[in-house]
Swiss-Prot record:
One GO cellular component term: cytoplasm
Family (UniProt): Belongs to the class-III pyridoxal-phosphate-dependent aminotransferase family. HemL subfamily.
Locations listed in the record: Cytoplasm
Entry protein name: Glutamate-1-semialdehyde 2,1-aminomutase
GO BP annotation list: protoporphyrinogen IX biosynthetic process
Organism of this sequence: Aeropyrum pernix (strain ATCC 700893 / DSM 11879 / JCM 9820 / NBRC 100138 / K1)
């Protein structure tokens, strides 16, 4: 078992220290208590209880190279030897910015921050500052962090104004965010017909990664781009997950769509805290100190993060990361399909390159409402069975399975067999 006596004792201590015993809610979803990690290397996590686990979570997306990749480790050690915080610019942020912009916004500009939440918050403020408008449009099931403007769900069917999904978010703030279904062109057109001249920005995950994995319909993306441009709203592509995972050009290159503002995180930090906002010079020049849209941060463009991110992107350019990751996810998809096809049980597997999720009890998942109808109890049992077999998938089917460079050879064999045998066990229970 991944969680043993040492993990249990640590959890008893942390329950007295942290709300719910953890510092991010999803970590508490591993039952009966989280396993505590001693170290990570390659495809594996090693727990304080002596278990070795194949990691198909990869820190919820950032570690596409796996744990402790040699080039990232070397870059971080070299950066640490030079000092780890200056309060002044360094060369690494210049090199990383040039590399990122070359792929996601040629000729544009970028601002580094410290998390995806900070990045989406800054992007929304920037869209409002640029357009002079007040409303933001988001989509049901898309996750954009933990600030007030995006902790919002759809209200009554008669209105598009959002309602808070968290205590502490004022209703007046939530009403500045419109919410409509993902992948629904007709609903999108209705929102723009009614509110188009007030919408500052449309923020969207090109592939939903926090209601399971839900790929976009191409006509939906095309409508997003067309309606945003026609109305004068800025299209904000939240590529915190998809950026540098679907390819070097992210979802923009993969789906042939262009955002006005691109939000990045996760992979570009190489496993260290990071976020970024990229856009045209016209839009980005509004950020302080050049313009009047405020953003600042002691840890923005942190030297260690910049070094890790630069090493990661170089590895993505030079190593077979995308092909290996894709084939690993494909192998998992095929193993699950092989077992489930024999049962007659309705299911669907959504996979986009190296991110995927399995939904039991539904034959299609193209929006969050359909994802929520999937059999959650089945998935939790699957998660638990796989953990018993030394394979870690997210504890909720509203998260994603991620594969990366180290998921090959023995690690992939363990993962595939763990999935296959776990499915058979759950189906037989």
């Amino acid at each position: 078992m991944a969680s043993g006596e040492k993990s249990r004792m640590l959890f008893e201590r942390t329950k007295e220290l942290f709300p719910g015993g953890v510092n991010s809610p999803v970590r508490a979803a591993v039952k009966p208590y989280p396993f505590y990690v001693k170290r990570g290397e390659g495809a594996y996590l090693y727990t304080v209880d002596g278990a070795r686990i194949v990691d198909l979570v990869l820190a919820y997306g950032p570690l596409i190279l796996g744990h402790k990749h040699p080039r990232v480790l070397e870059a971080v050690e070299e950066a640490l030897a030079r000092g780890w915080l200056y309060g002044a610019p360094g060369e690494a942020e210049v090199l990383l910015a040039e590399k990122i912009l070359g792929y996601v916004k040629r000729g544009g500009m970028i601002r580094f921050v410290n998390s995806g939440t900070e990045a989406t918050m800054t992007a929304i403020r920037l869209a409002r500052g640029y357009t002079g408008r007040d409303l933001i449009l988001k989509f049901d099931g898309c996750y954009h962090g933990s600030h007030d403007a995006v902790l919002v769900a759809a209200g009554s069917a008669a209105a598009h104004y959002g309602v808070p999904t968290s205590a502490g978010v004022p209703e007046a703030v939530a009403r500045l965010t419109l919410v409509t279904p993902y992948n629904d062109v007709e609903a999108l057109e209705r929102v723009f017909a009614e509110y188009g001249d007030r919408i500052a920005g449309v923020i969207v995950e090109p592939v939903i990664a926090n209601a399971g994995v839900i790929p976009p319909r191409r006509e939906f993306l095309a409508a997003l781009q067309r309606l945003s441009r026609e109305s004068g709203a800025l299209l904000i592509l939240d590529e915190v997950v998809t950026g540098f995972r679907l390819g070097l050009e992210g979802a923009q290159g993969y789906f042939n769509i262009e955002g006005d503002i691109i939000v990045l995180g996760k992979i570009i930090g190489g496993g260290f805290p990071v976020g970024a906002v990229a856009g045209s010079r016209e839009v980005m020049s509004l950020l302080t100190p050049q313009g009047k849209v405020f953003n600042a941060g002691t840890f923005n463009a942190h030297p260690i993060t910049m070094a890790a991110g630069l090493a990661t992107l170089k590895a993505l350019e030079e190593e077979p990361v995308y092909s290996v990751s894709r084939e690993a996810a494909k192998a998992l998809e095929e193993a699950a399909s092989e077992v489930l096809d024999r049962t007659g049980l309705p299911y669907t597997i959504n996979r986009v390159e190296s991110m995927m999720q399995l939904f039991i009890g539904v034959e299609e998942v193209s929006n969050a409402a359909q994802a929520r109808k999937a059999d959650k109890k089945f998935y939790v049992k699957l998660h638990e069975e796989m953990l018993r077999r030394g394979v870690f998938i997210a504890p909720s089917n509203l998260e994603a399975v991620f594969t990366g460079l180290p998921h090959q050879g023995e690690a992939l064999e363990i993962a595939v067999e763990g999935l296959r045998s776990s499915l058979k066990t759950v189906l037989g229970s």
